[in-house]
């Protein structure tokens, strides 16, 4: 029988529900239990694929091509599992499915309502994930904050699941904030009490309360929370700001959170063996070197827009015993005139993925600087496309060369639409998405990084390198070092006469893990260290 854990949040959003859920998942997996995890998002968008990164942070792509919430990245990195489209559920998806069923006549003329039709569809998404994975435990994080109008159907659905499967098979975790009032020198539990009161008014009694705090939580304060929220003091778990996120599972284990969970769910399992994880955290806290990477993008004011890229850089740094210092460089402020001054202190330059024409020339200026000055360069998706545009302009001398996405009327469309994309009208869910194979050319930097000639990586793009320019590029020194297995699509390019200049069409950041860094990131950071 699958057991169900639901993680809710109160007081404020962005409180760390995702990290809590992922960390608990890691502990339970290390106790020998099979775990899957999903995120419920109350927004009406079908997925975050067309949302601005300023609204929602990065869009995380799964193997099967789902465009999902960035929390799925935390889940995959912490638990080391590959999730799928059933791991992210939105109000938009649920309402679309219910309306489709109504139009088909599935409800036999009945009045379609939030209860039971929307709540039943939500419950089915939980039970479907359990059936598909046959996991011992499924953890479901509910996005938003208790009290939000949008969250009410989700909370009602998870309340009903307790009756559907039995109280011994369901556990509720509520994460809240204990603010520190600096002027008074006090921490306040009242917001937590009110948040739990709101949750209980909806029929959900939390079994565990995780309190986010800057300061240590005293036993007296835990006793007070336990008294007013009707749980044991041992079930109040402190979650303080950590030097590294990867210490959170160890902090939860120290407070016996996994023991409490298993006791509630009437499960027996051996203690979690966390030696490898402890070694990872020790390594992260004791890095002996530093390397500075210039990340050039247009969304740098919200670093969550590049969350997986930043994490993949850090993973690579751990492998090299190096702390990664990221210079968040706004590409809108980069010009040919100031690029040398902006880049003077960086050891490597990375241009990540993106869409649209804003701040493109700043990225191209950064790429030219990296190429000319032999600074290690790593381009991802748009960063690969612009590397070929820069090369076409400044090495091949093709004046006005550009991407058809940015300049549809360009004479030299170095980057153009995939043929199968030309008649597509909808933006959402129509990109080339998910895991695809790539064949790597022997004797290249890409092969040296991977140590093999066939890899699989996750993609998210609509435009592709135009093969009409391939021969010219290669003759001038830009090597096509990986393609799709049929040779049709260019996947990786690199420069022959450069210490390390590699750019890929796919998104390698999505498969990086803290204890298993992605190969191109690892070699890029190594090259940046050699450039110090």
From Swiss-Prot:
Residues 1-267 are annotated as: Amidoligase domain. Belongs to the CTP synthase family. It comes from the Bacteria. HAMAP family: PyrG. Catalyzes the ATP-dependent amination of UTP to CTP with either L-glutamine or ammonia as the source of nitrogen. Regulates intracellular CTP levels through interactions with the four ribonucleotide triphosphates. One of its GO terms (biological process) is pyrimidine nucleobase biosynthetic process. Keywords: ATP-binding, Glutamine amidotransferase, Ligase, Magnesium, Metal-binding, Nucleotide-binding, Pyrimidine biosynthesis. CTP binds at residues 13, 148-150, 188-193, 224. Allosterically activated by GTP, when glutamine is the substrate; GTP has no effect on the reaction when ammonia is the substrate. The allosteric effector GTP functions by stabilizing the protein conformation that binds the tetrahedral intermediate(s) formed during glutamine hydrolysis. Inhibited by the product CTP, via allosteric rather than competitive inhibition. The active site is at 381 (nucleophile), 507, 509. Pathway: Pyrimidine metabolism; CTP biosynthesis via de novo pathway; CTP from UDP: step 2/2. Its EC number is 6.3.4.2. SUPFAM superfamilies: Class I glutamine amidotransferase-like (SSF52317), P-loop containing nucleoside triphosphate hydrolases (SSF52540). It is an enzyme of class 6 (ligase). Residues 292-532 form the Glutamine amidotransferase type-1 domain. ATP binds at residues 14-19, 71. CTPSs have evolved a hybrid strategy for distinguishing between UTP and CTP. The overlapping regions of the product feedback inhibitory and substrate sites recognize a common feature in both compounds, the triphosphate moiety. To differentiate isosteric substrate and product pyrimidine rings, an additional pocket far from the expected kinase/ligase catalytic site, specifically recognizes the cytosine and ribose portions of the product inhibitor. Homotetramer. One of its GO terms (cellular component) is cytosol. L-glutamine binds at residues 54, 354, 382-385, 405, 462. Mg(2+) binds at residues 71, 141. It catalyses: UTP + L-glutamine + ATP + H2O = CTP + L-glutamate + ADP + phosphate + 2 H(+); L-glutamine + H2O = L-glutamate + NH4(+); UTP + NH4(+) + ATP = CTP + ADP + phosphate + 2 H(+). This is CTP synthase. One of its GO terms (molecular function) is ATP binding. InterPro entries: Class_I_gatase-like, CTP_synthase, CTP_synthase_N, GATASE, GATase1_CTP_Synthase, P-loop_NTPase.
């Amino acid at each position: 029988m699958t057991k169900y854990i639901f993680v809710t949040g109160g007081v404020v959003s962005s409180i760390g529900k995702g990290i809590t859920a992922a960390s608990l998942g890691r502990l339970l997996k290390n106790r020998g239990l099979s775990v899957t995890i999903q995120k419920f998002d109350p927004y009406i968008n079908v997925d975050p694929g067309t949302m601005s990164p300023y609204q929602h942070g990065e869009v995380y792509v799964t193997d099967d091509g789902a465009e999902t919430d960035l929390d799925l990245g935390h889940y995959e990195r912490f638990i080391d599992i590959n999730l799928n489209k059933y791991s992210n559920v939105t109000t938009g998806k649920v309402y679309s499915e219910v309306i489709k069923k109504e139009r088909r006549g599935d409800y036999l003329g009945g009045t379609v309502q939030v209860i039971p039709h929307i709540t039943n569809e939500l419950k089915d998404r939980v039970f479907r994930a359990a059936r598909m994975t046959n996991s011992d435990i499924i953890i479901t994080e509910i996005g938003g904050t208790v009290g939000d109008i949008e969250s009410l159907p989700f909370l009602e659905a998870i309340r009903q699941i307790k009756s559907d499967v039995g109280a011994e098979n369901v556990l509720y975790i509520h994460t809240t904030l204990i603010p520190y009032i600096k002027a008074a020198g006090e921490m306040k539990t009242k917001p937590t009490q009110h948040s739990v009161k709101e949750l209980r008014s909806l029929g959900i009694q939390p079994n565990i309360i995780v309190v986010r705090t800057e300061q240590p939580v005293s036993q007296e304060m835990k006793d007070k929370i336990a008294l007013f929220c009707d749980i044991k003091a041992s079930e109040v778990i402190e979650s303080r700001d950590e030097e590294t996120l990867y210490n959170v599972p160890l902090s939860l284990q120290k407070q016996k959170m996994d023991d409490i969970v298993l006791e509630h769910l009437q499960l027996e399992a051996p203690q979690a063996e966390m030696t490898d994880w402890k070694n990872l955290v020790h390594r992260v806290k004791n890095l002996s070197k530093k390397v500075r990477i210039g990340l050039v993008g247009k969304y740098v004011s919200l670093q969550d827009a590049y969350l997986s890229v930043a994490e993949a850089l850090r993973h690579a740094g751990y492998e090299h015993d190096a702390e990664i210092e990221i210079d968040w460089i706004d590409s809108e402020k980069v010009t040919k005139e100031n690029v040398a001054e902006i880049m003077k202190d960086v050891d490597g330059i990375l241009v990540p993925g993106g869409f649209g024409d804003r701040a493109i020339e700043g990225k191209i200026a950064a790429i030219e600087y990296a190429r000319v000055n032999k600074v290690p360069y790593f381009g991802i998706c748009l960063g690969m496309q612009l590397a070929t545009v820069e090369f076409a302009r400044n090495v091949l001398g093709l004046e006005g060369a550009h991407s058809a996405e940015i300049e549809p009327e360009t004479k030299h469309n170095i980057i153009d639409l995939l043929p199968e994309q030309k008649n597509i009208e909808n933006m959402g869910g129509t990109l080339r998405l998910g895991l695809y194979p790539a064949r790597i050319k022997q004797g290249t930097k890409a092969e040296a990084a991977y140590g093999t000639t066939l890899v699989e990586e996750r993609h998210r793009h609509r435009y592709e390198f135009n093969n009409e320019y391939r021969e010219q590029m290669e003759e001038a020194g830009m090597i096509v070092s990986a393609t799709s297995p049929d040779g049709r699509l260019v996947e990786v390019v690199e420069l022959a006469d450069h210490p390390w200049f590699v750019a890929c069409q796919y998104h390698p950041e999505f498969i990086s893990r803290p204890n298993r860094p992605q190969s191109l990131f690892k070699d890029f950071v190594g090259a940046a260290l050699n450039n110090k």
